[in-house]
Amino acid sequence: MSAQGDCEFLVKRARELVPGDLWAAKAWLITARSLYPADFNIQYEMYTIERNAERTASAGRLLYDMFVNFPDQPAVWREISVITAALRNDSQDKQTQFLRGLFETLPGRVQCEMLLKATEQCFNTLERAEMLLLLLRRFPETVVQHGVGLGETLLEAENIEDQESPVNCFRKLFVCDVLPLIINNPDVRLPASLLYKYLNKAAEFYINYVTRSTQTESQYQGSQDSSDLMSPSKRSSQKYIIDGLTEKSSQITDPWERLFKILSVVGMRCEWQMDKGRRSFGDILHRMKDLCRYISNFDSDAHAKYKNQVVYSTMLVFFKNAFQYVSNIQPSLFQGPNAPNQAPLILLEDVTNVYGDTDIDRNKHIHKKRKLAEGREKTMSSDDEDPSGKARSRHIAVNKADLANSIEVLESFKLARESWELLCSLESLDKEFTRICLSWKTETWLWLRIFLTDMIIYQGQYKKAISSLHHLAALQGSHSPQQITGQGSLENQRALIQLATCHFALGEYRQTCEKVLDLMCYILLPIQEGGKVQEEQPKVKSKFRKGSDLKLWPCTSRAIMPYCLHLLLACFKLRAFTDNRDDTALGHVIVLLQHEWPRGENLFLKAINKICQQGNFQYENFFNYVTNIDMLEEFAYLRTQEGGKIHLELLPNQGMLIKHHTVTRGITKGVKEDFRLAMERQVSRCGENLMVVLHRFCINEKILLLQTLS
């Protein structure tokens, strides 16, 4: 029998003995190896027996022998491939743990060599990168030789694969796994240009990861408490799987913390003017402002260095705080489909002073049939209100019930705003920041456009804000899945109400009215009369000039409809109380003053005073929409001798009736009787839901309302 035949016989005999007598099988193989030490099959069979019996130490020794003596055998590499896969695997099953333990028994030098050779066997870029990553983590000394090369390979693979989003498997491995190993190793020498390139890639990845919207999360699983979702760092614990990676590998804890750590390390390597210890965002921003004051005094190299410090430090403070603001005022952008529904908040001009400046006792009602001299005091006109609100510092009011952490959120808004202003303050900073934003395609970030729109409104640049809102509408159109759901109509509401508030601030009252009336189509009825809501929302006395206050309003029908009515009233009262007579505008004002009655009592008295001065008044929609008992009694009083016998044309076609007939005693008596009956019918309607009445007024009289402001 030949030597090969002998080996095969011995291996076969050992296999037959394994089920019944393991020790006998091992004895046969030990004998066989002593006779034929160069035969691979004998050693491999010995290894197989030890591996199947899960004897870690002996299996490890045999694997080591095979790796040294038979490095070209495919079976050895198949085995090594299984072991390295177990090292990369997140699983905790018994077999995987055994294979990891087996690898640990190998000498460090062999582990390193094995991983290097295993890497050479990989033709898949991702698998090869993960294998090299194993090597770099276990043997930090290899980072100098292989770290930068691996990083560049991953970035090159990202370009070759033409990844749509920076949040992809290649970028994740580079930013989260490879980059920290490179920049934290003092033996790896990197030019500043490469460090800035890597910082840029890391910032783009982390910001996109944290701000990924629900539309892009096709593999999003589960949801979280709304309180947790307020925190961008906590939000990262949602189950989100990056294509090509495992669930565990896709999770990133404290992404902002990681990003600012990279910023700090890069800053030290680039010899920035760094502060020792941890600094708040406010401190960082203050430091950058100081640096900007004397940045122009440096030579070109130092200027470039500190320019990069200011741009990257300020930019990261900006994006962090802008996201913090938007994720709190509109959390639905970043939550999963099963998350609790929280109404978004919208930044609007505060028009709660629409009723005038005179303090009103809200519990007081109009004295029935008061005498003209006593009851009709002149109220202060608000014609002189300055709606532009271009004060440098403006107060933003918000109810605690709508936003529990309002102090922190408004501080984030302030920091983001100041960061943006700093980045735009010098041409060199602005140019670099713009370049980065273009490369990141930030113009497609819906959440960022929401922040920028609010910031522009805050700055009082209303024409620019209108352009920004049109940009926002285009972005929302590109996020088509949301348009199918309620989110689409919600975004439309946000755009319409902010457009309305901007047009109002510009004095463009017809456009204001148009947007408000379009918005009324989205209002869900019924809404309870909100007369007492304002009592729960005391007006904050601000040190800023009149008309400069802003407020964060919930985007709900209950909150938005009262705001719309305020805007309409503000538009029409300017026309109603000018020297030129406009009964239609005055009639619209009277209808709108029913809302939150008696807050508008003084303005109503001003309207009555104007009617008395005119001696007559025509408004044929009166009985369609005026149901307030105090107003009805006042108008009934106007027709009496004591009230001044004011000529009122409040019935439809009443004017035509008088014009086309000879005014006889009988016809006049008939008109009086019609008026009395109409008043009686109207009194019976006083219990109607006023918000339903006013909503009907806005919908049915849209053409008339717009014509009045033309």
From Swiss-Prot:
Disulfide bonds: none annotated. The keyword Nucleus applies. GO terms for cellular component: INTAC complex; integrator complex. It is found in: Nucleus. InterPro entries: Int_cplx_su10. Residues 372-381 have a biased composition (Basic and acidic residues). Residues 366-393 are annotated as: Disordered. Its main location: nucleus. GO terms for biological process: RNA polymerase II transcription initiation surveillance; snRNA processing. Keywords: Nucleus. Component of the integrator complex, a multiprotein complex that terminates RNA polymerase II (Pol II) transcription in the promoter-proximal region of genes. Component of the Integrator complex, composed of core subunits INTS1, INTS2, INTS3, INTS4, INTS5, INTS6, INTS7, INTS8, INTS9/RC74, INTS10, INTS11/CPSF3L, INTS12, INTS13, INTS14 and INTS15. The core complex associates with protein phosphatase 2A subunits PPP2CA and PPP2R1A, to form the Integrator-PP2A (INTAC) complex. INTS10 is part of the tail subcomplex, composed of INTS10, INTS13, INTS14 and INTS15. Belongs to the Integrator subunit 10 family. This is Integrator complex subunit 10.
